[in-house]
């Protein structure tokens, strides 16, 4: 018996290998999935007969789900139902269990249920997934009357009537969408369960079967809910996704459903995509994938809406006239006749204007969605150059209401891509990195959604400054249009901000916008990265940084628009990017720039600023009973840049801690509320290796440094401040963890022995698939006798500790550091000097660059 199973197992292996060869040679995927199902039939029937279950009328073997539909993928589960009569003996049931064991022994991944008709029907009446799989039953072997009885008992007359089944499947899809963040355009999409995936096709067939009692979706053409063209589109989407899924199973050697980064690369190679000068093979493949997903989701939406109208509202219509062209039918907008778009193509955009103007409209009727899709050819050059068209499009953003849902529909139905050629080029365009979580078109729409959220009460607590600014914004449509165009030139090569500004300029001219409005939109697109780059890469506590930033703002109002766009952009790029740290940096930059712009004051010199901050801090300390003489004695040892970098409240806190301390090093760990992180403050006798020790200890405690200010005082004491975040990029509040880090820092900083070893940690799975070439650039700051070192490289555990050891080895002194991580990419700025306290010369830069590249390349754990 064991030998028989071994032979069968080998036969299955050989057959699947042949299918893989056929598939690699471009064999038809529908034929392959059917061949696999039929082949598995023969194996199961053979095992069923071997276990003597085919005799008499006691048992029935049924294929369910995709196997029942004859659509078996390479490593899909094989869903089986074994029905038996009430009178079967224990011996016969044991044979059924033995049959299942044999299936497992020959390597078949079988999911099964052994039950009676009545028990199965009872379960189906309570479980949506059971009734759905039963509707795909296929008789393999045994007494067919049992299957017929199950069909009868699970008929809509007895359970799950059409409308109830429809609502349940709709809710199931909504829950599935929510699980995947309402978008199919994720970095690693799920081909089976993600929005626009294969489940979106299966739900259409399931509802059709339940309501119309059809067996195949093609039969729906006769019922009028799908056209020949739409069926061909669905068939194309299905075959594309089947091919990708079969290849994914083949490459993974298991039932993998997620297109992870490593498989994306392999799939692109398998399907023959090749790198081009400005777009990678993987990006081309994923762009095609996302276009199919988009089309699939669009058809899913339209047909589900048709089912809703047919199954739920087939006799209940409440009509409300909107104008001569549109009306509401049960709160869904529709054309008043099928000639509307042909007679006036501008009405295509007018429909979406109504969706924004009337937030109570729940959606678009299926017949009108179909008419939009069939009328896209009307949106030609003449349509796009029409002044009426231009006015309608811009007015979509001028209603004062949220345009996000309407724009999402415009994107799904293909209207945006037909109206804006430049938008068509970024539709489905992914960026192969960990920083950008969505395709460019979906990211753009998420940015617009975020802008709208700033107006809503439920988001006011999360974004209080944004809520305050946007309510006073003179023309919100400018912000929306800036958002629409900010990434419009991605994927072309070159500076997408500059290229996008050209597109924005052409758009504003074609849409007859006022000169001032046009200037602001174009400026927003050109400088949409200015605020985030300034906040994350430069010293925003330096008055010169604020002055340079403000010089790029043509008018004070530009700051409000830029701040809102920056926050919306970061939040719409990746859900993990926004945190209290970035929030605090941008707010501080905003407020500093606002003060500078509105007061129209001359730039205060550093001495004046230091004096002001000292006085405020002094007032705080004196109110706590500390002598001004003691304070001044201590402060006389501090460098001026310390007072520039810290607020009066923080200066007072540090001063108090030092004066109250009886031993060194002084190490304080506490929340830094204004900066959204946790502050590590260190005061101790000078020690060259203290930056290396600190970065190593913090790395071992799995925290990340966001900013570092390193100062050696005139009394040869070190005055260092770090802002750190936990593994989730948040300030940590765990007091025990803070005490552990504090103790570890005190022990190692006081120790004159060896440097602490850095614990070796594996790179995350995602990080291993990206290779950012290490880039190092130097800029001399002659005013401060420092050199700015800008470093770009792959993120990895312990990176900063590695860099600090290079600095220590080469006697490089660090004064300040700004740490920015964007997905797999690290962009760090270090302000350094040589051991004599001056900017690095050419030779020192060369040696440092070579050493950093070498050590970083060795630190890939």
Swiss-Prot record:
Domain of life: Bacteria
GO biological process, one term: regulation of nitrogen utilization
Regulation: Uridylyltransferase (UTase) activity is inhibited by glutamine, while glutamine activates uridylyl-removing (UR) activity.
Gene3D superfamilies in alphabetical order: Beta Polymerase, domain 2 (3.30.460.10), Hypothetical protein af1432 (1.10.3210.10)
Keyword annotations of the record: Hydrolase, Magnesium, Multifunctional enzyme, Nucleotidyltransferase, Repeat, Transferase
Residues annotated as domain ACT: 679-760, 788-861
CDD domains: ACT_ACR-UUR-like_2, ACT_UUR-like_1, HDc, NT_GlnE_GlnD_like
Domain HD, first and last residues per copy: 440-562
Cofactor annotation: Mg(2+)
Coiled coil feature spans: none
Segments of this protein annotated with the region Uridylyl-removing: 322-678
Homology family: Belongs to the GlnD family.
This protein's name: Bifunctional uridylyltransferase/uridylyl-removing enzyme
Organism per entry: Legionella pneumophila (strain Lens)
């Amino acid at each position: 018996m064991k030998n028989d199973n071994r032979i069968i197992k080998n036969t299955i292996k050989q057959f699947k290998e042949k299918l893989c060869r056929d598939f690699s040679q471009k064999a038809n995927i529908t034929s392959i999935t059917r061949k696999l199902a039929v082949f598995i039939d023969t194996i199961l029937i053979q095992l069923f007969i071997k276990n003597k279950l085919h005799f008499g009328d006691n048992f029935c073997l049924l294929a369910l789900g995709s196997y029942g539909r004859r659509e078996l993928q390479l490593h899909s589960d094989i869903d089986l139902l074994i029905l038996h009569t009430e009178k079967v003996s224990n011996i016969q049931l044991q044979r059924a269990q033995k049959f299942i064991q044999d299936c497992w022994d020959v390597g078949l991944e079988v999911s099964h249920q052994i039950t009676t008709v009545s028990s199965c029907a009872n379960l189906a009446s309570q479980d949506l997934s059971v009734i759905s799989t039963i509707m795909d039953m296929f008789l393999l072997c045994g007494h067919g009357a049992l299957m017929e009885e199950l069909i009868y008992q699970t008929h809509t007359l007895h359970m799950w009537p059409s409308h109830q089944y429809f609502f349940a499947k709709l809710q199931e899809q909504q829950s599935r969408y929510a699980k995947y963040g309402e978008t199919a355009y994720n970095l690693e999409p799920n081909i089976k369960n993600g929005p626009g995936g294969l489940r979106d096709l299966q739900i259409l067939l399931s509802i059709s079967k339940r309501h119309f009692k059809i067996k195949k979706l093609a039969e729906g053409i006769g019922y009028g809910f799908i056209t020949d063209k739409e069926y061909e589109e669905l068939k194309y989407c299905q075959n594309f996704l089947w091919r990708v899924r079969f290849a994914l199973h083949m490459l993974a050697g298991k039932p993998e459903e997620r297109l992870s980064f490593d498989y994306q690369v392999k799939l692109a190679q398998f399907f023959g995509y090749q790198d081009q000068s400005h777009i990678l093979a993987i990006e081309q493949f994923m762009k095609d994938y996302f276009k199919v997903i988009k089309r699939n989701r669009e058809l899913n939406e339209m047909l589900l809406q048709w089912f809703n109208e047919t199954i739920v509202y087939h006799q209940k219509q409440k009509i409300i006239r909107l104008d001569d062209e549109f009306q509401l039918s049960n709160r869904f907008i529709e054309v008043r006749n099928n000639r509307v778009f042909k007679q006036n193509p501008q009405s295509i955009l007018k429909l979406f204007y109504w969706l924004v103007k009337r937030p109570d409209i729940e959606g678009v009727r299926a017949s009108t969605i179909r008419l939009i899709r069939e009328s896209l050819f009307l949106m030609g050059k003449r349509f796009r150059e029409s002044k009426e068209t231009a006015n309608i499009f811009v007015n979509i953003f001028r209603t004062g209401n949220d345009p996000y849902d309407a724009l999402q529909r415009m994107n799904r139905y293909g209207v945006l891509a037909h109206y804006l050629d430049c938008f068509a080029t970024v539709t489905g365009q992914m960026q192969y990195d960990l920083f950008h979580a969505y395709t460019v078109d979906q990211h753009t729409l998420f940015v617009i959604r975020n802008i709208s959220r700033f107006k809503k009460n439920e988001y006011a607590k999360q974004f209080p400054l944004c809520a305050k600014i946007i309510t006073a914004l003179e023309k919100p449509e400018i912000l929306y249009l800036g958002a629409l165009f900010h990434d419009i030139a991605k994927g072309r090569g070159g500076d997408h901000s500059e290229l996008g500004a050209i597109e924005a300029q052409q758009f504003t001219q074609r849409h007859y916008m006022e000169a001032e409005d046009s200037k602001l939109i174009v400026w927003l697109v050109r400088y949409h990265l200015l605020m985030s780059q300034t906040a994350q890469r430069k010293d925003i506590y330096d008055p010169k940084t604020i002055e340079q930033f403000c010089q790029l703002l043509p008018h004070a109002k530009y700051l409000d628009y830029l701040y809102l766009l920056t926050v919306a952009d970061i939040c719409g790029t990746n859900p993990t990017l926004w945190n209290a740290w970035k929030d605090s940096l941008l707010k501080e930059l905003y407020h500093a720039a606002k003060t500078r712009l509105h007061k129209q004051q001359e730039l205060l010199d550093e001495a004046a600023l230091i004096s002001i901050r000292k006085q405020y801090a002094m007032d705080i300390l004196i109110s706590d009973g500390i002598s001004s003489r003691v304070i001044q004695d201590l402060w006389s040892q501090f460098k001026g840049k310390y007072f520039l970098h810290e607020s009066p409240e923080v200066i007072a806190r540090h001063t108090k801690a030092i004066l109250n301390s009886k031993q060194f090093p002084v190490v304080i760990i506490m929340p830094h509320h204004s900066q959204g992180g946790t502050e590590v403050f260190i005061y101790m006798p000078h020690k060259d290796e203290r930056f290396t020790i600190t970065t190593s200890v913090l790395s071992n405690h799995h925290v990340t440094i966001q900013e570092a200010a390193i100062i050696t005082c005139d009394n040869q004491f070190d005055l260092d401040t770090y802002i750190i975040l936990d593994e989730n990029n948040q300030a940590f509040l765990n007091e025990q963890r803070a005490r552990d880090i504090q103790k570890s820092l005190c022990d190692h900083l006081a120790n004159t022995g060896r440097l602490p070893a850095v614990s070796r940690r594996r790179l995350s799975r995602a990080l291993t698939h990206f290779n950012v070439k290490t880039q190092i650039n130097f800029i001399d700051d002659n005013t401060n006798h420092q050199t700015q070192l800008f470093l770009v490289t792959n993120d990895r555990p312990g990176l900063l500790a590695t860099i600090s050891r290079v600095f220590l080895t080469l006697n490089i002194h660090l004064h300040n550091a700004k740490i920015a991580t964007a997905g797999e990419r690290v962009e760090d700025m270090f302000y350094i000097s040589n051991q004599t306290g001056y900017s690095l010369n050419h030779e020192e830069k060369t040696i440092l660059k070579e050493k950093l590249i070498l050590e970083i390349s060795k630190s890939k754990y």
